[in-house]
């Protein structure tokens, strides 16, 4: 029988930062051989409690940590590692130019490990870890050559090779396809069967419900409670996380009209990226594209924004054939594009919220003398912050000080500032908690109600189903199906994607 006795118990855990009480008297027990999900919005304290467990942060006085039967008042990174606590962060912290073997066995050859590098022993250790979770990875392959999913498995193998007894996974599925997610969840269950405690952090509530034995919900630095997963559903979990009830129903149906499409794509192709794409998008309409990672969705959007060139086909805007040679052409034709990667492509994280918001309209905010009209610019920024409901204490602060949800709203605001007729949103809710997801989709709905045409890439079928007038499915560079949410069930779209997945 699986051992479910406590591996670590945290009592009276508080953590204060200047002006913020990140943890407020949290009590948490993690058991051997269980999958324990930490759920909560961004900023609720999940990352802080993980850093207390891994010894990065020391809690305030009065804390007690019972780790494998021994009492501590705080942990250190080396002490946590000694007891088998391993954290797999979103960036995975792998060495891309090292082989799979070297990454898995690296802990033995860091300071405090063996002096001599024994290649044969390293390989045996790596193969044993790979075998233990039942996967197949080439031990000699450089990590930089691996898919994100395989890198995730390498990080798990490294934890196992370090004799992990508690593995904490922070947003492990954020960049994985559904098939890869299924593979990862199978590995998580293998770890559980081996008596290892797995702490699983994810914004995807369906995955949480699928894999968890117990769920601890955090809100505003406090533990709301710990619940058997069998006693919750995703709607109740969302309520516990946010204190709000979300009512989901498809958007009001848009009746067919003879209105000319705002955007029309005819037989658009780019070698090895997408083939024979035909789609239309009308004023006031939200159309989503779902599909697997690598299906060509982002590549198509990049061409619609002039960043890459199709080899054949046509793009029509407001009934006129256009040639989008670059993004400047796209902007002139009224197209805005919110990138899937806000950290490196969507925002300049070190620059201010103010600068990020006006960067797309900088040339329109000058006085006749050529100087920036700060009054006009500040009015624009203030209006956008208010209209998009962005929580900002001071627009002159760096955008990196914002939460993920508010940073994403700034990425949208900078394009709304251009008054586009067509707005492309590429995976706008990646890494965003449930309340902010709803807020971002409310922005999309509001923009559509104002007459904007919105094209979205969605990674989660429910999000597309409840926030689109039409849902398109893309596979291997081709659009293969179209759904009207008022004439189908959510499961029908999922079934098509699952068929595509096989």
Sequence positions of predicted segments:
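Glycine-rich phosphate-binding loops of nucleotide-dependent enzymes
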Residues: 2-502
């Amino acid at each position: 029988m699986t051992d479910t006795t406590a591996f670590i118990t945290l009592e009276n855990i508080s953590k204060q930062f200047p002006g913020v009480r990140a943890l407020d008297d949290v009590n948490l027990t993690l058991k051997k051989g269980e999958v324990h999900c930490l759920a909560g919005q961004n900023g609720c304290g999940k990352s802080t409690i993980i850093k207390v467990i891994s010894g990065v942060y020391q809690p305030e006085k009065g804390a007690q940590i019972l780790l494998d039967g021994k009492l501590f008042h705080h942990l250190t990174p080396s002490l946590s590692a000694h007891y088998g606590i391993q954290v797999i962060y979103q960036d995975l912290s792998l060495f891309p130019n090292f082989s799979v073997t070297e990454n898995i066995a690296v802990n033995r050859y860091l300071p405090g490990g063996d002096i001599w590098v024994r290649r044969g022993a390293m390989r045996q250790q790596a193969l044993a870890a790979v075998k233990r979770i039942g996967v197949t990875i080439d031990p000699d392959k450089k990590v930089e050559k691996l898919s994100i999913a395989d890198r995730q498995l390498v990080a798990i193998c490294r934890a196992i090779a370090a004799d992990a007894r508690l593995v904490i996974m922070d947003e492990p599925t954020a960049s994985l396809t559904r098939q890869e997610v299924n593979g990862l969840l199978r590995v998580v269950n293998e770890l559980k069967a081996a008596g290892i405690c797995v702490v699983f952090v994810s914004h995807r509530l369906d995955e949480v419900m699928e894999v968890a034995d117990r769920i601890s919900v955090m809100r505003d630095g406090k533990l709301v409670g710990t619940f058997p997963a069998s006693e919750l559903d995703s709607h109740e979990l969302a309520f516990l996380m946010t204190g709000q009830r979300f009512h989901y129903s498809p958007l009001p149906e848009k009746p067919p009209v003879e209105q000319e499409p705002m955007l029309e794509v005819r037989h658009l192709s780019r070698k090895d990226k997408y083939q024979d794409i035909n789609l239309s998008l009308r004023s006031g309409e939200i159309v989503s594209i779902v599909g697997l990672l690598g299906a060509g969705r982002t590549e198509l959007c990049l061409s619609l924004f002039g960043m890459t060139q199709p080899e054949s086909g046509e793009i029509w805007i407001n009934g006129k054939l256009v040639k989008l040679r670059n993004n400047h052409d796209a902007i002139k034709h009224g197209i805005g594009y919110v990138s899937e990667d806000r950290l490196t492509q969507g925002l300049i994280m070190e620059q201010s919220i103010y600068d990020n918001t006006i960067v797309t309209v900088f040339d329109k905010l000058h006085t006749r003398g050529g100087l920036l009209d700060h009054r006009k610019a500040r009015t624009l920024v203030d209006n956008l912050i208010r209209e998009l409901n962005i929580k900002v204490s001071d627009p002159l602060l760096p955008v990196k000080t914002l939460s993920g949800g508010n940073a994403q709203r700034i990425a949208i605001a900078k394009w709304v500032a251009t008054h586009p007729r067509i707005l492309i949103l590429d995976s706008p809710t990646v890494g965003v908690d449930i309340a902010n997801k709803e807020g971002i989709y409310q922005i999309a709905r509001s923009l559509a109600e104002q007459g904007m045409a919105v094209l979205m890439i969605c990674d989660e079928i429910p999000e597309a189903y409840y926030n689109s007038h039409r849902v398109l499915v893309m596979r291997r560079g081709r659009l293969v199906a179209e759904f009207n949410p008022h004439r189908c069930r959510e499961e029908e779209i999922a079934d098509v994607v699952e068929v595509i997945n096989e």
